[in-house]
Amino acid sequence: MMHICYLTGLYSRKDPLIFDRQGKALAMAGYKVTIVVCDLEPNETIDGIEFISCNYKPCSRIERMLNTKKFLYRKALMINADVYQISDPELLSLGVKLKHKGYKVVFNLREFYPGIIHDKAYLPKMARNVIAVLMEKYLKSSLKKYNAVFTVTDDTDNRLEKWGIKNHY
């Protein structure tokens, strides 16, 4: 049985996309599904989906961006799934690291992150353009290393095509 593992430090256990739409559909189709989350809740199985906690919950956005990767990476190596899926932009490097270890890794590009940086009130206005440009370059270089990228809009799909990323769906 193929084992698919979702890694997230951003989304909750019952995120509508990860748990309800993707996870349940895969479990019902006969796949083993694990969702690894950064929270302090006990491990459990719901609707055939195994939830594993990192036993770590970041207290701030900065802490989440800096620390969740190491906790999720340790759990990912222990789980040894066939495919890992990541949806968090701050985990792009984690996916690349898993890919270098020989794992299959996919990224779910839910939003075009460089485009939404301009709306982030917590970022200084003067820095948003620079951060957006850097994020776009980082996203482009990272996603080329993934086995597949899932998109939700034609605009994002077209952008990935222009970047030369062929494995997007």
What residues fall within each predicted segment?
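Nucleotide-activated donor-dependent transferases that construct or modify glycoconjugates
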Residues: 1-19
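Short amphipathic alpha-helix
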Residues: 15-29
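A short, charged, and often flexible helix/loop element on the N-terminal side
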Residues: 49-74, 122-128
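Acceptor-binding helix/loop patch of EC 2.4 sugar-transfer enzymes
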Residues: 56, 106-137
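Membrane-proximal helix-turn-helix segments that form the acceptor-binding/catalytic region
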Residues: 70-77, 97-101, 113-114, 128-149
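Short N-terminal targeting/anchoring amphipathic segment
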Residues: 74-92, 103-106
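Helix-loop-beta element that forms the nucleotide-linked donor phosphate-binding surface
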Residues: 150-151, 156-169
